[in-house]
Amino acid sequence: MAIDENKQKALAAALGQIEKQFGKGSIMRLGEDRSMDVETISTGSLSLDIALGAGGLPMGRIVEIYGPESSGKTTLTLQVIAAAQREGKTCAFIDAEHALDPIYAKKLGVDIDNLLCSQPDTGEQALEICDALTRSGAVDVIIVDSVAALTPKAEIEGEIGDSHMGLAARMMSQAMRKLAGNLKNANTLLIFINQIRMKIGVMFGNPETTTGGNALKFYASVRLDIRRIGAVKEGDEVVGSETRVKVVKNKIAAPFKQAEFQILYGEGINSRGELVDLGVKHKMIEKAGAWYSYNGDKIGQGKANACNFLKENPAVAAELDKRLRDLLLHSNGELVAATNEGFDDEAETSEEF
C-alpha cells in the first residue's frame, strides 16, 4: 500500500533524526539488510537440534534448561560449550553451585584451558559478571549454573531463617531487563540452568515450577525440560541414562517437539547412537537382521558395533550427520527461519512427560 508523499517525507526525516541521535541501524525495516535466519550452536545431540527446528540453540538469545536432579542439565550445557569451542568461539561458565568438575568437562570435549570460569559469592556478582562479559563483545557463550544458586547478597549476609520474600525474583527481573538488549547486540548466547520446585496446595494441573520468579520464563527464547526416563545397561551394569528433552518454549521455530537420546557416564551424549537410529529411520543406513550397512558396505553386527565403526571413521560419521541435517533441517534449500516470534508463554505448557 502506497504511503502519502508528505508522510513519506516526514517518515524519512524522522528516521534520519533517529539514526543521527542513536546511530546507524537503531531503526530499520524488518526485511532490510539483515538475515532472518538465526545463527545457532549445536547442542551435541542431533535429535535435539532437529527438535529445536533451527539446528541448535540461537545466538544472541536467552535459553533456560531445567529439570530434576541428575537429569543431564550440566552435561547438556558442557556439550554446547564443546561444540562452540570447536567453532573457535569463546565460552564462560558461571559456577554459582561451585560444583563444576573440570575432569568430567574435559572428557566431554571441553577445552578447559580456554574456558573462562567464575565462582561468584552472590547472585548479584554472578549477574554483573554476565553483563560485563556480554558488554565486552568477546564472549560467545555464557552458562549460569544455576538460577537456584544465585543467592541475593542480603540473604547471604542475613541470618538463617530470615524472610527474604521475592528478593531473588526481583534480582532476576532487573538482570533480564539489562541483559536482553546487550546479548542481542553482542550476539552472545546466555544459558541458565534451573531447578524444579513444587507449588504447595496445587490440586489440579502440574505442581512443578522453576526458581527465580517469572521474568526468565518471559525473556527466554527457548526453554528445555530435560528428564531421565530410564537406564542404559550393559549386562547388569548401568552405564548411562535414557534422556528425553521437551522444547517447552521456542521463539525461533515450532515449540513442543521432543527428542530422546542416551547420556553415557563419562562420555556424554551418545551422538553416534543417534546417527545410527536416525540413519535407519530415514533409510540412509540399511538394517538386515542384526547387520547395519552404509552405502552398501557393512559397518557392524549390532548397534554397538555400528557405533564403534562411526567412532573409528569420523569422516563417515560427519558425512552421515550432514546428510541427516540437510534432510531434516532444510526446507526448499533454506534453513528454518525465525518466523515463529508469535509463540509466547500463553501457549506454553510445562506438563510432565
From Swiss-Prot:
Gene3D superfamilies: P-loop containing nucleotide triphosphate hydrolases. GO terms for biological process: DNA recombination; DNA repair; SOS response. It comes from the Bacteria. It is found in: Cytoplasm. CDD domains: RecA. InterPro entries: AAA+_ATPase (IPR003593), DNA_recomb/repair_RecA (IPR013765), DNA_recomb/repair_RecA_CS (IPR020584), P-loop_NTPase (IPR027417), RecA-like_C (IPR049261), RecA-like_N (IPR049428), RecA_ATP-bd (IPR020588), RecA_C_sf (IPR023400). Pfam families: RecA, RecA_C. Keywords: ATP-binding, Cytoplasm, DNA damage, DNA recombination, DNA repair, DNA-binding, Nucleotide-binding, SOS response. This is Protein RecA. The lineage of its organism: Bacteria, Pseudomonadati, Pseudomonadota, Gammaproteobacteria, Enterobacterales. GO terms for cellular component: cytosol.
